[in-house]
């Protein structure tokens, strides 16, 4: 049975490649999806790759991943909640409520940026937190999930 990795991207990540390239790099979200597709293929994993600017959509997708997790069909979730990392109790509750293994991911090193970005509601519920590796962090997170 092939397990699935969900890669969920939060607000403004649809602007990758044009938004603050000095912080986030020049690769687009489509480039990130290709990177994730290749990483999953290396491990024989299926990929669900999504982005939304809406918190409720991210919650719904975590619930969807939770159903796969309950059926033993989920390798894990790579969650780049973007700004919702610092504000969303709803995402925290979704992760806790479903028990999905989550890697919290940030393209930039959030700890080297503004102080409001230093706090994560999700970190305590995540299996791992990765930041500062650029978009390559997505592939590294998938590599980690494949080992669990």
Swiss-Prot record:
CDD domains: DHQase_II. The gene is aroQ. Pathway: Metabolic intermediate biosynthesis; chorismate biosynthesis; chorismate from D-erythrose 4-phosphate and phosphoenolpyruvate: step 3/7. Transmembrane segments: none annotated. The record marks 19 as: Transition state stabilizer. SUPFAM superfamilies: Type II 3-dehydroquinate dehydratase (SSF52304). Substrate binds at residues 80, 86, 93, 107-108, 117. It holds the Pfam family DHquinase_II. GO terms for molecular function: 3-dehydroquinate dehydratase activity. This is 3-dehydroquinate dehydratase. The active site is at residues 24, 106. It is an enzyme of class 4 (lyase). Homododecamer. InterPro entries: DHquinase_II, DHquinase_II_CS, DHquinase_II_sf. Its EC number is 4.2.1.10. GO terms for biological process: amino acid biosynthetic process; aromatic amino acid family biosynthetic process; chorismate biosynthetic process; quinate catabolic process.
């Amino acid at each position: 049975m092939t397990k699935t990795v969900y890669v969920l991207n939060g607000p403004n990540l649809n602007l990758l490649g044009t938004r603050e390239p000095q912080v986030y790099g020049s690769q687009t979200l489509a480039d990130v999806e290709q990177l994730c597709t290749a990483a999953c293929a290396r491990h024989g994993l299926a990929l669900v790759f999504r982005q939304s600017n809406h918190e409720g959509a991210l919650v719904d997708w975590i619930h969807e991943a939770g159903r796969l997790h309950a059926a033993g069909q989920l390798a894990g979730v790579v969650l780049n909640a973007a700004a919702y990392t610092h504000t969303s109790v709803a995402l925290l509750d979704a992760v806790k409520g479903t028990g999905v293994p989550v890697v919290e991911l940030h393209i930039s090193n959030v700890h080297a940026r503004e102080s409001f970005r230093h706090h994560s509601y999700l970190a305590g519920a995540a299996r791992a937190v990765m930041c500062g590796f650029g978009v390559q962090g997505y592939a590294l997170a998938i590599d980690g999930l494949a080992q669990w």
